[in-house]
Amino acid sequence: MAAKEIIFSDVARTKLTEGVNILANAVKVTLGPKGRNVVLERSFGAPVVTKDGVSVAKEIELADKLQNIGAQLVKEVASRTSDAAGDGTTTATVLAQAIVREGQKYVAAGLNPLDLKRGIDKAVAAAVDALKTISKPTTTSKEIAQVATISANGEESIGQRIAEAIDRVGKEGVITVEDGKSLADELDVVEGLQFDRGYLSPYFINNPDKQIAEIENPYILLHDKKISNIRDLLPVLEQVAKSGRPLLIIAEDVEGEALATLVVNNIRGILKTVAVKAPGFGDRRKALLEDIAILTGGQVVAEETGLALEKATLAELGQAKRIEVGKENTTVIDGAGDAKNIEARVKQIRVQIDEATSDYDREKLQERVAKLAGGVAVIKVGGATEIEVKEKKDRVDDALHATRAAVEEGIVPGGGVALIRVRQAIRELKGANADQDAGIKIVLRALEEPLRQIVTNAGEEASVVVAKVAEGSGNFGYNAQTGEYGDLVESGVLDPTKVTRTALQNAASVAGLLLTTDATVFEAPKDAAPATAPGGPGAGGPGFDF
């Protein structure tokens, strides 16, 4: 085990605070509509230009071990806030720095750090309650666009794209962000349920222009095993042929004689069919087949459900208004499933989301909810260069997360004003002793910091603006984009309540831990390697001229 060094009390806290300040100073230049970019070096490829706080924080590793520990603690604030709310990482970093800075003064003056932390926690709890009181739900597409625009650093086109995507797929729908292939941003919306499996034979194609198979008003057979023997399929094929409607077969695989017979019948016009593989693998495949069955009003023909393929009837088949099958994707549009059954299935999957332990499982379950409840929208981010697309894509991701947070917990006035307003609820607070009162004062001062930084980044005098905003009430605040005072909600400067709440709670949590630290243990630096390698001068080896 490597040797460790231990640093105590003020020396440790001073070094940790230096690390906090180095990271926070790099991150906070990005805050607000007039915040600046930060350029990040990459070990390979082009550098990255970003205005995303957590991206900047993640890149920072300091040479000094003690300073680096402080920086990593604040990095944790940004990461936690990003994970929980998807935005607000810079605000969280600024708040953490302010709490640490103010707290250090009191600790140096001899106040009890644990009582300071208790006072901080008490003030933050009161601030969170006050935030919930002034929060209002997002009800209109315009408000959603405004939240997204603010999070995307004032770019209205991004806000409009996200609002349009939510309009199209609903609040439950999946919205993904991809690199585009043109200069402009594009929005693609997939209606209905889509899964990533295409036709098993190109002979199923009946729309050569689009290179897809389209079938109207089809029956849908769902089977969890391979189909290779046509005799197993014949009974259900005969029933579908009599009905005069087409058939989509979704199974683990369709091969050999069965696939050949389907292709021949399709070409001759005897029975219009399309066969595709079932999506997913293992248990996930079973779950996805069940989702499709509920959406289309059918049943999965499987041993587990007591149904045999050779005994399947039209009653077990699902139905839909239209099916589109491409080379790689199948889309089921307007399935005939019962709305109550679909709703029950969505609730069931939501319970699984709450219980999921891995991000991957949670993401896949959320995709299933979206496919059942809404749809899928893809925002393709355009730009002239790869660097521009990457930077813009980060902002679209932030805006998307902020929008979801706003839908979840509502909105408050932006521009740091909500944090100024909740100070009123903290002023009346009293701690159990004078040290706890000092902890409450730390939070009172720290709550000004996001507004101060926004104003500083806009090139104005922070103290003057903070004083004027504090004199006002409600939504009155400073719009850094226009340089004017007014009603921020009316002018569209909004923040999601969840983002503001999460930023404050995480900042106070980590800053409080840092203030109560009295010893730091870290790995001792290794001794420098000898300057002369073996076999060099004086080692007794032969001499060489180079």
UniProtKB/Swiss-Prot annotation:
Instruction: Give the reaction(s) catalysed.
Output: ATP + H2O + a folded polypeptide = ADP + phosphate + an unfolded polypeptide
Binding, ATP:
30-33, 51, 87-91, 415, 495
Q: Does the keyword Chaperone apply?
A: yes
Q: Which PROSITE patterns match?
A: CHAPERONINS_CPN60
Q: Which residues form a coiled coil?
A: none
**Could you tell me where this protein is found in the cell?**
Cytoplasm
What's a single GO BP term from this record?
protein refolding
Region of interest (Disordered), residue spans:
527-546
What keywords appear on the UniProt entry?
ATP-binding, Chaperone, Cytoplasm, Isomerase, Nucleotide-binding
- In this chain, composition skew of type Gly residues spans 535-546
Quote the PANTHER family the UniProt record gives. 60 KDA HEAT SHOCK PROTEIN, MITOCHONDRIAL
Described purpose of this protein according to its UniProt entry: Together with its co-chaperonin GroES, plays an essential role in assisting protein folding. The GroEL-GroES system forms a nano-cage that allows encapsulation of the non-native substrate proteins and provides a physical environment optimized to promote and accelerate protein folding.
The record, for NCBIfam families, names: GroEL (TIGR02348), PRK00013.1 (NF000592), PRK12849.1 (NF009487), PRK12850.1 (NF009488), PRK12851.1 (NF009489)
Describe the protein's quaternary organization and the partners it interacts with.
Forms a cylinder of 14 subunits composed of two heptameric rings stacked back-to-back. Interacts with the co-chaperonin GroES.
Q: Which family does it belong to?
A: Belongs to the chaperonin (HSP60) family.
Tell me what this protein is called: Chaperonin GroEL 2
Organism whose genome encodes this protein: Burkholderia ambifaria (strain ATCC BAA-244 / DSM 16087 / CCUG 44356 / LMG 19182 / AMMD)
